[in-house]
Curated annotation (Swiss-Prot):
This is Metallo-beta-lactamase type 2. Binds 2 Zn(2+) ions per subunit. One of its GO terms (biological process) is response to antibiotic. The gene is blaB7. Substrate binds at K182. It comes from Elizabethkingia meningoseptica. GO terms for molecular function: beta-lactamase activity; zinc ion binding. PROSITE patterns: BETA_LACTAMASE_B_1, BETA_LACTAMASE_B_2. Its cofactor is Zn(2+). It is found in: Periplasm. Residues 1-21 form the signal peptide. It is an enzyme of class 3 (hydrolase).
Amino acid sequence: MKGLKGLLVLALGFTGLQVFGQQNPDIKIEKLKDNLYVYTTYNTFKGTKYAANAVYMVTDKGIVVIDSPWGEDKFKSFTDEIYKKHGKKVIMNIATHSHDDRAGGLEYFGKLGAKTYSTKMTDSILAKENKPRAKYTFDNNKSFKVGKTEFQVYYPGKGHTADNVVVWFPKDKVLVGGCIVKSGDSKDLGFIGEAYVNDWTQSIHNIQQKFPDVQYVVAGHDDWKDQTSIQHTLDLISEYQQKQKASN
């Protein structure tokens, strides 16, 4: 896709990213754009340690957090750290799908007084699983404006899960891909227990068509600085499908 192909060269620009010293070694925060930060948290899944990436935006009204730290033990450390740095509180939290590395902080942020959001589809899944839910829900696509900051939540279709959405920050041309976008160093599609692999390719193409001028893509796990993630995701899907076909 024009605008996403060749984004590897942009990775050179990441060498100047500012990394903040955190008290919790399982939390890392890096400045991506003027008021947009990537936060990475670490947790163990089936005996292997993984990194989960998401972002927060500092606005004139307060801080908007997309997704949540991966693991309850990191919630307070995370909010303490960003308050210490910015002197502002979290006023909004949006979960990009129902898994714990995305929706796990809804209850915590809600108790802090933040407005919490998810799609109705995510809310339905959380309800069935008896997990904490967002206070506010919306249909698959929604535009937000917080102070002077505008961003958009977009549902591209099924992929990693039925309910996965992405978040677009138009001013910064940053796409928060969540778990539907695999990192450039991913060896496979990861957890696919709730995936719709046959729909995944079209959903990625929908993202490409919707946001043709992306400059930075933040993949949901592992190395988000490798800007080949969109194409690599398509390659991984194709590889998986070929293996499945060969085994049948």
